Every structure is written in structure tokens, then in C-alpha cells.
Amino acid sequence: MPPLRLTSVLHTALPDLSENGRALLSVLGCFNGHPPCSHELAQWLGFHDRYQLARALRREGLPPLEVIGGWARTLYWMSEAEGSGKSLRELAEREKVDPAIAYRLVRRVTGRRWSEVRREGLALTMLRFRDRCAKAAPRPTANLGTPPFLLAAGDPIPRPPAATTRPIRSTWRGAETRARTTLARPGHRVVQGISERVAVDGAPFDVAFAASGEALVTRPHAAAVDVLQLNPFGVSHTIRVGPTPTRVIPTARNGKNGHVAYVTTQFVEAVRIIDTERRQMVGSIPVPGHPLSAAMSPDGHTLFVTTNQDRLVAISTAQRTVVGSTAIPLTSPQLTIHPSGRWLLVPCWRAGVIVEVDASTLAITRRFDVGGVVQDVVVAADGQSLYAANEAGWLDVIHLPSGRRTAKLEFGTGALGLATSADQAHLFVGLLEAGRVLILQRQGLIERAVIPTGGRPRLIAPHPAGDGVLVANEAGWVDLLR
């Protein structure tokens, strides 16, 4: 997943911005220079409202959002025109924009006609953009507990509305189920339906259980990680980490730093360190590119992270620095480590392959060609079987000792999230577009239940003791399945 061309252009034009200024440019790059409404953009970057964002832009030395957005749009069209030879009219019509509006936008932000801008070329236009933002300068990182971009605004840390736990009607039981004071232990009982649901805004993506028994949920569109308590089920705290937190990796339950978790925050190009006891961010580890997925070595000494520069990097958790890296084709937000700790299994998204990497040398040892668009992967506790969800509509099973695919189960719809139950008896598969979670008996891949969650179920976290399963849903909630 290489960097978007517009993102690279913007970062090249303004190389000296703070990490949060670069995060703003990354968001503009994601939307081809046409960001969502200013309020939504403010939420992505961790601000309370658009006014706070505007004040931060002024302190960062950047022009108003309307101006910088217009320049980003113009640079996008310039980049596309040079790459494809298309006219501005063709580019505008492709995006369902009135060509007259596009021509006026270019004239307004650059002071020149499109024909003049095209003759000057992209490089000179980038220089003019840099000159327009000449006051931009790097800003020092103040308190790590609060995003520097937020501190620059001089405003208090915003508190999101309290999430609510509400009763829902279970499709499988046909009766209303309310929050209970204790959670039942299902053991080997198959999960039957949704027990409870808590509203979580910001497009929840990943969910994982911390050593304390609480759960951590990443909110990419809210620049935060929420702490979920199970009894009663709800959000207890919010930890601000910076734009686009994607994966969260708590340390081992029996480790000396069991209260620490690592969060890949894409647009600040760093892995954040949070303390789940103190409920705050306590550190940051810069990485080359936007960090996507992560996995911790069994001994807790090394954190492995993939980035959008198509690289796998190894981070020393003691030194808090990158100690090694290797090239990986088309990385994605998914990654897992073999129970032995000897190998990493890295899905390569649209490349349709999974690569096995030696954890000590970062050398690629094997490739498994499965086709499609590989998403989440898990390895059975005995280390014998690799399971891979595929967005093209199936699940692969690979026998790791031999490297052969031993089974393939078709779903007819894209699969994304994947997890094994605490007792290793079942697999949980999130069907993203269908809005369902499929429960399979691991032996024989026999379907045991289908739970309609609605929305867009993302990643899945079974409780280590078997006390239910959490499913992050991009539509704005987290489900507790029992």
C-alpha cells in the first residue's frame, strides 16, 4: 500500500511541518484534496470543532483550510494531468465537478489560468504552494499526554459524549437482553448472538483486550482510543493519541509492563505508547511512513510494524526505536506472529500472497499464493494451521509444516476480520459488506452460527477467558457477542 501520490507531493512541498501538520496533509491526500466538511476533518485530527482547527492552523503557520484545500485540489489535478495527459475538463467531469468551478478554483488559489499553470508544470506549482505557506515551521512537541496540534490551539482536551449502553433485541433469542452485573463463562458453548452494544463514534476499527481485562478500541476518525469496561458494558475512558489510530497491541498479560499498549497512528507516522492504568499517552516511536499493522513478539522485546512504504520494521520496545526493516509487497493493516515467535505471517493485500518472515533476521522464508485480496490472518495455538480471510469472498486454511493449502471455504461476500476462540474450537469471521459475523467450528470448518450485526464489522477480539467476543463496527458501535 504505497503512499498516495498527492500525499507525497504535499509532504515534499512542506517538509518542515510538525507531525500534526503532516497529518493534515495526509488527510487531504486521502481525499484527493477535497476533504470532508471542516467539522468532520477536525474530528479526524482530534479537535473539538472547526474553530479549534482553524486556530491551530494559524499557529502552525498554515493558511486557512479553504485555501490549503484549494491548493491541494489544484496539485492533485496537476499530478493527474501530467500522469494521464487529461485536460482539467476531463478530470473535473470524472469527479462530477462542474468544469467551470474547477477552472475558477485554480485561478482563485494560484492567481493564474489553468493553461498557464500547466505550462509551468507541477514542480513550479509546488514551489508556489510552498511560498504561500512560507510561514509554516516545525513546532515542538509539548506534553505527550496531549496531541501537540491540540496543545497549539490553546484549548482544553475535548471530551466526547458519553457512550451509551442500550438493550437490543437478539435475533437468535427473540427477547430483549439487558446489561448484567456479571458475564457468563460460555466455555465451549457456541456464541449465539449479540448480548450488548455500546455506541462508539469515530469509525471503530480494532479492538483488543488489555491485561486488566478491559478492552481497547481504536477510533480512526476521532484520533483516540477508547477503554471499554465489560461490567457494566460501556466506555470508561478516552485516550487521545493523534490522527488515524488503526491497530492497538497490548503487552502480554503476564509481562512486567502489562499496563502498556502500542497504537499505530497512521497520519502522525509514529507508534504511540499508552498507559492503560494512567489512561494517557506516555510515549511515541517515529517510523518510516504511515504505520498500519503491528504484532508483539512473545517475549515483549520487539514490536513488528508494517508501513505504507511497503516495509516491515522491527522496533525495540526497550530502546523505543526502529532496529531493522525489510521490504514487503503491498502491506496492509493485518499482521500476525507464529506462537513460537520464530516467524511473522504478513498478508500482502491486493498482491494475493502471504509472506512468512523470519522474526530474527526479517528475511522472507516462504510465500503462500492464495489470490484475491488477503485481509486478517491468524495461526492456531498449536502452530500447525494458518487461517486467512479474503476480501474476495473466502477463507483459506494453510498447513504450515508443508506449506500447502488444505481447505478453502467460499462465502460469496468479502471477509475481513478473523479470530479464534479462547478454547481454539471456533473461528469468528467478519463479513464486512454483509454486516454479519460467521462462527465456524475450526475442525471441518462447519458453520455453527451466523450473527447479523449490521453495519460494517471490522476486527474481532475474543475474551482470553472465554467471556464473550467483541466486534468493532465501523458504523459506530462495538458489539459484545455471547
Sequence positions of predicted segments:
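Alpha-helical bundle regulatory/interaction domains
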Residues: 1-171
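Predominantly soluble domains enriched in secretory-pathway, periplasmic, or organellar proteins
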Residues: 163-482
